[in-house]
Amino acid sequence: MKRRELETALRTAGRVARETEFFLIGSQAVHAYCRRPPAEVLLSQECDLYPMNRPEIANLLDARLGRGSRFARRHGFYVDVVTPEIASLPTGWQSRLKPLRVGRTTAWCLEVHDLIVSKLAVGRLKDLEFVGALFQRRLANLKTVRHHIRQCSRHRDRARLRSRLQSVLDELG
């Protein structure tokens, strides 16, 4: 998703929901950190968004802007309404959110290292490729990612995250 497409999604979500603040927890959060994100970000057709102050409007957003909606058919991208609980995130992630302002709407974006931990937790090939692209573009610091992994609550999760991180690093050579 290109930045202008993300901006369209955010403006429309704000208008539909009459909400000014959202969590942006997926790969599109990278737009808050760089003007020219990795190609893996541009390929995505969705932004993972959650209404920050009014979770009860999630169903409305999904119906109006979600996959298969008129908005999605018209624009070729959609809003995937999620909850922050679906992401495996290290302790303190809320204090590291970065704002991305579009008009009156603010998307609070995951900090890039928290985003990497979340993507490692999901572990799909596209997520691991995304993580690799962030390292290749020098948008992330390995030491910080390792620190964030140690901040995850369950030992079993930390071991899985370390293993997936090592796989990404091995692929990068």
Model segments located where?
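Compositionally biased terminal segments of proteins
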Residues: 1-173
